UniProtKB/Swiss-Prot annotation:
Pathway: Glycan biosynthesis; glycogen biosynthesis
Family: Belongs to the glycosyltransferase 1 family. Bacterial/plant glycogen synthase subfamily.
Keywords: Glycogen biosynthesis, Glycosyltransferase, Transferase
Gene that encodes it: glgA
Family annotation (Pfam families): Glyco_transf_5 (PF08323), Glycos_transf_1 (PF00534)
Recorded catalytic activity of this chain's protein: [(1->4)-alpha-D-glucosyl](n) + ADP-alpha-D-glucose = [(1->4)-alpha-D-glucosyl](n+1) + ADP + H(+)
Record-linked Gene3D superfamilies: Glycogen Phosphorylase B
Protein's name in the database: Glycogen synthase
Organism: Ligilactobacillus salivarius (strain UCC118) (Lactobacillus salivarius)
Length: 476
């Protein structure tokens, strides 16, 4: 089977979030565990690290018609981990300091999507499955059928759309059909690509893709409701026959406390002593009193309302009344950044805040903390709770989306569970679960049992990739 993954970001080349993690891990795992021909196509963001740039080779170049303009498109190639990566090169669109957030986003992704389709014949690779991800590539299934459907070689291509976050849909004015895609406005006027008063890439992808999936089973159910559907719930209910949820995995090689080079001491579920050393080192790194006995509650995240930080801010005064230490790593909303700097200054023995993002420090936090707080308002999948369990740090989560699918709340009667969860999105219920975690922490034998249960969970990509392969096989 010939597979082509299309997306806007991919670890380790460039990433801003979970999409980059999935694009990095899923193709690599399929290539490692099967004999499928696996390839990935990405924009060539010029900020890519030199170690990868130096491995690029030139494949071909051509021009893509974006409205009345002929835009240069170079195709570069890199092979790594049995995966062939193609990079679409255009300095006008992709030679910028960041990945997203520019005035011409619609034009950038219009060029990218048309370039991907036009590239296929030129490189001599016609995939059986073209797997697109989020709105940046969600228009491809529509374009394949309506703009490029006359090309015989393309007619057998099946498409899969993965929704990583439904909040971002790619909404642009009616004029983009003619000005960017050279298509008739009738596709807008008859409602095919329109949602409300805009061309909507995501909605169109849901209509035209052969299969649609989200990154957790619960999120697949949630987005069919008005509360989580971001306006597209009715469309998703109409097409739920082709919708499913597949829980993301995490990279077990990179996220391994027994071998992680970022840690002061390595450890495993059988030998947990090293985790105490990592805790003491983490306390020292954040300027907190070095105490083995005090529970450390950590957060590693973008500081946004989606991640539930309004609950943390509202309850911080109550939280610091307990004998705990709180550690925060992340950047985001300026108000939240200010709040956590204030808490760290006001409670220097209780709160440590690093308003930055540092991958190595994140790994040391996963290892050195006792609890990982993740009170997201909504969470399509979430990877941090899986990583924290892998490192024996018990998650305290709002039970929605992928958090509900991956964290088994502690049952005090049976002693089973891998973390703690609350259903109502409020500071009061969050604090109740934190106190439940603190009570268990005081019982060291029971706590260690739950830590080992959490560390024994299987969130590897080998498990997740098999579900994707099953979906592909249904189409081919």
């Amino acid at each position: 089977m010939k597979l082509l993954f299309a997306g806007s970001e991919c670890a380790p080349f460039f990433k801003t979030g979970g999409l980059g993690d999935v694009m990095g891990a899923l193709p690599k795992t399929i290539a490692k565990t099967t004999d499928n021909d696996v390839r990935v196509v990405l924009p060539f963001f010029t900020g890519m690290a030199e170690e990868y740039k130096s491995q690029l080779s030139f494949v071909t170049s051509f021009y893509v018609k974006v409205g009345w303009r002929d835009q240069y498109c170079g195709v570069l190639k890199l092979e790594m981990d049995n995966v062939t990566y193609y990079f679409i090169d255009n300095l006008y669109y992709f030679d910028r300091p960041g990945l997203y957030g520019y005035y011409d986003e619609g034009e950038r992704w219009a060029f990218f999507q048309q370039a991907i389709i036009e590239m296929l014949e030129k490189i001599g690779f016609i995939p059986d499955i073209l797997h697109v991800n989020d709105y940046h590539t969600a228009f491809i299934p529509f374009l394949l059928k309506e703009k490029y459907g006359w090309i015989n070689a393309y007619q057998s291509i099946k498409t899969v759309l993965t929704i990583h976050n439904l909040q971002f849909q790619g909404e642009y004015g009616r004029e983009v059909l003619g000005e960017l895609f050279n298509l008739d406005a009738s596709y807008y006027d008859d409602g095919t690509v329109r949602f409300d008063t805009a061309v909507n890439f995501m909605k169109t992808g849901i209509l035209y893709a052969d299969k649609v999936n989200t990154v957790s089973p619960t999120y697949a159910s949630e987005i069919q409701t008005e509360a989580f559907g971001q306006g597209l719930d009715e469309i998703l209910r109409m097409h739920n026959w082709k919708l499913r949820g597949i829980l993301n995995g995490i990279d077990y090689e990179r996220n391994n406390p027994a071998t992680d080079k970022n840690l002061v001491a390595n450890y495993s579920a059988k030998k947990l002593k090293g985790k105490v050393k990592d805790k003491l080192a983490l306390q020292k790194e954040f300027g907190l009193p070095q105490r083995k006995d005090v529970p450390v509650i950590a957060m590693v995240s973008r500081l946004t309302a989606q991640k539930g930080f309004q609950l943390v801010v509202s309850e911080m005064q109550n939280l610091v009344q307990f004998d705990v230490q709180v550690i925060v790593l992340g950047t985001g909303d300026a108000n939240f950044e200010h709040d956590f700097r204030y808490f760290a200054d006001t409670y220097p023995d209780k709160v440590g805040a690093a308003i930055t993002f540092d991958v190595g420090l994140a790994q040391r936090i996963y290892a050195g903390a006792d609890m990982f707080l993740m009170p997201s308002a909504f969470e399509p999948c979430g990877l941090s709770q899986m990583i924290s369990m892998r490192y024996g740090t018990l998650p305290i989560v709002h039970q929605i989306g992928g958090l509900q699918d991956s964290v088994q709340p502690f049952n005090p009667v049976t002693g089973e569970g891998t973390g703690f969860g609350f259903h109502d999105f409020s500071g009061f219920y969050m604090m109740q679960e934190i106190q439940e975690a603190l009570r268990l922490y005081a019982e060291s034998v029971a706590w260690t049992k739950v830590v080992k249960q959490a560390m024994s969970q299987d969130f590897s990509w080998e498990t997740a990739s098999q579900e994707y392969l099953n979906m592909y096989n249904e189409l081919v």
